A protein has these predicted regions:
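Single conserved hydrophobic/aromatic residue that forms the stacking wall/gate
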Residues: 1-7, 11
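Short, structured coil segments at secondary-structure junctions
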Residues: 6, 31, 53, 80, ...
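Short alpha-helices
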Residues: 14, 99-153
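Long, compositionally biased charged/polar accessory segments in the mid-to-C-terminal portions
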Residues: 14-16, 70
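A general structural motif
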Residues: 35-45
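Active-site-proximal loop->helix
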Residues: 46-56
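Glycine-rich phosphate-binding loops that contact phosphosugars or nucleotide phosphates
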Residues: 60-108, 128, 136
Length: 153
């Protein structure tokens, strides 16, 4: 169902916010779906107005002490009919039992958690964009209107 949607919202808090931006960019580049990356705390400041039945909402989440707020935001999207895709560690997945689809990443209980989690989550983000694009029939090897390099003049 995600592959036929016209839009998608991608959310995350703190260190994973750049991953939400990159995940949304990959969806745009190869599947031609309008997607936006947002910090989870910003959802009520506009993006929630776009959520309706079957709109995919993707969240990257790790158990870092702030996950309850993010899961609450995700629950609000779910209550408005969004299709929830959660890429998270087991602790977060266990708390968000309402998610339609989950991808579990390894958990880290050390000082490297914030550094390693974005690396692990980038793989499912890229695979999601790839499979959505393939489902839509787009050419993932030669996306339209993209240049391999940017020249600054």
């Amino acid at each position: 169902r995600s592959s036929s949607s016209a839009a998608s919202d991608v959310y995350k808090r703190q260190v994973l916010y750049p991953l939400a931006l990159e995940g949304a960019l990959k969806l745009k580049e190869i599947s031609y779906i309008h997607a936006e990356g947002f910090a989870a705390g910003e959802m009520k400041h506009g993006p929630i107005a776009l959520i309706e039945d079957n709109v995919p909402v993707i969240m990257f989440l790790v158990s870092d002490g702030n996950e309850e707020k993010a899961i609450s935001n995700l629950q609000e999207a779910y209550s408005r009919g969004a299709k929830i895709i959660l890429i998270a560690d087991k602790k977060c997945i266990d708390k968000a039992t309402f998610a339609h689809f989950t991808v579990e990443i390894a958990e880290f209980e050390n000082e490297f958690k914030s550094l390693l989690s974005p690396l692990l989550m980038s793989i499912p983000a890229q695979l999601l964009a790839y499979h959505v694009a393939k489902e839509r029939g787009t050419d993932v090897d030669q996306p339209r209107n993209l240049a391999k390099s940017v020249t600054v003049e």
